[in-house]
């Protein structure tokens, strides 16, 4: 599919987006990226995401995804749109509805009259079990839009990201990890580099929705113990009871709807399983060991 195909990558300054830009280029695509701040493209991204080089992109479109009036011509010549746009950490007081839903809706609206052949969207695994969450509602509203759009579409559903595991290593280095709930829920997070490859396979394949996990299935408690093992310190875990965490969520929600929604997602993730097909190859141990050793590209 890559022969003379142009892909637009939206979310290119985020964790997965940076890996996706590099992967699409390596697979022979012409890569256009959408960003509101071109300088950020060439800086290392959040949570060990790599810096993008000028060789990784063919053209940069500077615009504000939340402002369609700045996006004229964005889809010109584009065959495939890849979007990992969404809130990874709460900033600017924006809601999941405003970012995860509305910004992707803006992209979809631009695609329909422009001849874009396919749209690849990164949602989340297990969404059907947590539809009460604002983040899940926003993601699945985008999925519904794509289903009704008339375009070909593909949905990638990761089972969590290695980027979220770095906090375990940080806590282990400090000598104590804090855990919401008993930590016995199972997960199979995936490295961003591996997930980017899954996204390209999905973009080029026939499977409509793809779940993607890493090679390891473990509990949150086991992952925390692994982090302590990697840093060579005794395991010390403090459990925050679920009732206390839920109380904190309600309090935070009274102060800020935006932060309350994010807190509710974090707490809920501490009590449900997130396991899917093992499509990634990088083990969590290898990632944490490389991260601990100071490898800039773990």
PLM features per residue range, with description:
Residues 5-29, 35:
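N-terminal Rossmann NAD(P)H-binding glycine-rich loop of SDR-like oxidoreductase domains
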Residues 87-173:
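Glycine-/Pro-rich loop/turn segments that contact NAD(P) or position catalytic residues
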Residues 103, 181-202, 208:
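Substrate-positioning beta->alpha
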Residues 163-170, 201-210, 233-235:
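Glycine/proline-rich active-site loop of Rossmann-fold NAD(P)-dependent oxidoreductases
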Residues 180-185, 210-217, 228-232, 240, ...:
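Glycine-rich Rossmann NAD(P)(H)-binding loop
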Residues 222-271:
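Terminal hydrophobic/aromatic helix or amphipathic segment near a protein terminus
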Residues 269-298:
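Amphipathic terminal alpha-helices
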């Amino acid at each position: 599919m890559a022969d003379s195909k142009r892909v637009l990558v939206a979310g290119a300054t985020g964790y997965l987006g940076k890996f996706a830009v590099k992967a699409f280029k390596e697979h022979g695509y012409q890569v256009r990226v959408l960003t509101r701040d071109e300088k950020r493209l060439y800086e290392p991204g959040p949570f060990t995401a790599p810096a993008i080089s000028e060789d990784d992109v063919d053209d940069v479109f500077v615009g504000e995804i939340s402002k369609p009036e700045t996006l004229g011509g964005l889809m010109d010549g584009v065959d495939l749109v890849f979007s990992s746009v969404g809130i990874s950490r709460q900033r600017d007081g924006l809601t999941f509805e405003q970012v995860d839903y509305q910004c992707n809706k803006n992209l979809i609206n631009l695609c329909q009259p422009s001849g874009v052949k396919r749209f690849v969207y990164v949602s989340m695994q297990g969404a059907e079990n947590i539809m009460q969450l604002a983040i899940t509602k926003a993601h699945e509203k985008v999925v519904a839009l794509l289903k009704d759009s008339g375009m070909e579409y593909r949905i990638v559903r990761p089972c969590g990201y290695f980027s979220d595991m770095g906090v375990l290593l940080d806590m282990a280095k400090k000598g104590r990890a804090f855990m919401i709930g008993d930590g016995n829920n199972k997960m199979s997070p995936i490295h961003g580099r591996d997930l980017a490859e899954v996204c390209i396979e999905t973009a080029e394949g026939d499977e409509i929705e793809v779940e993607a996990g890493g090679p390891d299935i473990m509990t949150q408690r086991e992952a925390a113990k692994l982090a302590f093992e990697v840093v060579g310190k005794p395991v010390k875990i403090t459990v925050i009871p679920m009732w206390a965490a839920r109380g904190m969520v309600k309090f935070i929600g009274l102060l800020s709807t935006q932060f309350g929604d994010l807190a509710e997602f974090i707490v809920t993730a501490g009590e449900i399983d997130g396991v899917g097909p093992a499509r990634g190859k990088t083990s969590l141990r290898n990632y944490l060991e490389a991260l601990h050793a100071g490898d800039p590209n773990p």
